[in-house]
């Protein structure tokens, strides 16, 4: 990994820590931020790029010195599980008491975000792990462009991808592989249809596919996830004023095929979701 990339990653981390939600814990001039500016901090992680996908546990082991400075002790469930739950609560806030470990969780999530962005550039696209979001040229002329751009900003701000990567290591579920696979199939088909002349809003398909199962992170213990995650998915999009994408995202069950008319975007998502479930 060359020095230019390390400098870019250092800059990306500082910018991430100066934006919400990290900015709630790291004020300008913070001692840790000053250290990051002079140390070349991301060089520490260069050895993790060995041609394989990064493991959150390996990143955590290299972040521990900073976490010890930021927080008194360690969460009882461990840093990875705590960071996972913290990110989940960014999507679906809950009433909690004081969170003394929140600065550490935000720092770890921010480091993961920078590292995963570098990983996406260095490794080949994997439909089960990564998302091929739309380019600016593809987005031009889309009626859903404003909502889609907002979706991508919130995807980063709320650490959605990092949440799913952590989930592979701290839960028994493979939610990332399912959501990424659905996105790949739906967007690939939408791009092909658009190229052939069919009127399809690829941005609407991409946003709905990437967000179609976010509601699973809103379900609470004891709730019936297969039924209620549609409601929580719709809730996430509505609260963030992206109802155009949310309407398609929340109605992806095969039972939604019953109405006489569905948009091509909705049909693509339902098909992709069904196909990925068959594959697994």
Task: List where the protein language model places each region.
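Internal, Lys/Arg-enriched amphipathic helical interaction segments that engage polyanionic partners
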Residues: 87-146
């Amino acid at each position: 990994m060359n020095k230019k990339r390390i400098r870019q990653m250092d800059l990306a981390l500082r910018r991430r820590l100066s934006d919400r939600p990290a900015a709630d814990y790291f004020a300008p001039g913070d001692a840790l931020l000053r250290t990051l500016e002079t140390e070349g901090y991301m060089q520490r992680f260069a050895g993790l790029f060995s041609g394989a996908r990064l493991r959150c546990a390996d990143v955590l082991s290299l972040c521990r010195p900073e976490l010890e400075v930021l927080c008194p002790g360690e969460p009882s469930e461990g840093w990875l599980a705590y960071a996972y739950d913290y990110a989940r609560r960014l999507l679906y806030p809950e009433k909690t008491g004081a969170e003394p470990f929140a600065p550490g969780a935000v720092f770890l999530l921010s480091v993961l975000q920078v590292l995963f962005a570098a990983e996406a550039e260095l490794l080949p696209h994997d439909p089960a792990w990564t998302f091929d979001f739309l380019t600016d040229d593809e987005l031009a002329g889309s009626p859903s462009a404003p909502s889609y751009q907002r979706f991508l900003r919130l995807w980063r701000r709320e650490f959605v991808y990092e949440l799913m990567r952590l989930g592979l290591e701290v839960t028994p579920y493979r939610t990332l592989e399912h959501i990424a696979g659905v996105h790949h199939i739906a967007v690939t088909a939408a791009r092909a249809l658009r190229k052939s002349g069919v009127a399809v809003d690829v941005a609407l398909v991409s946003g709905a596919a990437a967000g179609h199962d976010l509601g699973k992170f809103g379900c609470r213990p004891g709730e019936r996830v297969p039924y209620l995650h549609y409601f929580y998915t719709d809730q996430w999009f509505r609260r963030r004023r992206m109802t155009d994408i949310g309407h398609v995202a929340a109605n992806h069950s095969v039972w939604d095929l019953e109405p006489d008319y569905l948009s091509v975007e909705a049909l693509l998502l339902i098909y992709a979701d069904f196909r990925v479930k068959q594959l697994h």
